[in-house]
Amino acid sequence: MVNLRVRCIVLAGALFAVAGAAHADDWTLDGVERVVAVSDIHGAHQELVATLQTAGVVDAAQRWSAAGTHLVIVGDIVDRGDDSRASMDLLMRLEPEAAAAGGKVHVVLGNHDVMNIVGDLRYTTKGEYAAFAAEESPAVREAAFQRHLSGRASDTTAVEDVRREFDHAYPPGFFAHRAAFAAGATYGKWLLGKPLLLQIILAGQPGLLTTLG
């Protein structure tokens, strides 16, 4: 298991490196007038919305209202809290809205975002899985259970007890969540296109704002 995790992390690192070489110019910004930075959302979606509204980044309808402002999300959208999907959906919607107004949304990857991509789910909550439950096929879930059950052929545990263990280990929505974070799927593809480093040169300022997720 440890070796598998190491291989996954190395693979993810290689993917990020390739993406970085292709889009490095997008991650170095010069002459930015205003930056709003938010870090460690961790599924606290309502708090994110309240913060953005207080900063004038979005209006009461959660639409971009900050003109040429650059919003920087400093890593860790996911894990620990239940509403990370709502936060990702909001940020994905705000990206084109900000661009149309002359601003920009930047998402810098944090370790928890990378962990979800590579399948390290130690801090993922049942609520985060539940957000994907409506998209989880009963057939996919049952097939996964049958594979789990076949691996315990010599076990004398009753099937209903094994199913309870299975449901605890793989809560409703687990398999749809994993599918959505695959490299070619909605959230996996979106996150894989994000940098690990963002450098902003503020207008009229001699220094740099350098952000690591």
Task: Put a short name on every predicted segment.
Residues A22-G213:
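Feature recognizes metal-dependent phosphohydrolase scaffolds
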Residues C8-V18:
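Bacterial N-terminal signal peptides
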Residues M1-R5:
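N-terminal secretory signal peptides that target proteins for export/translocation
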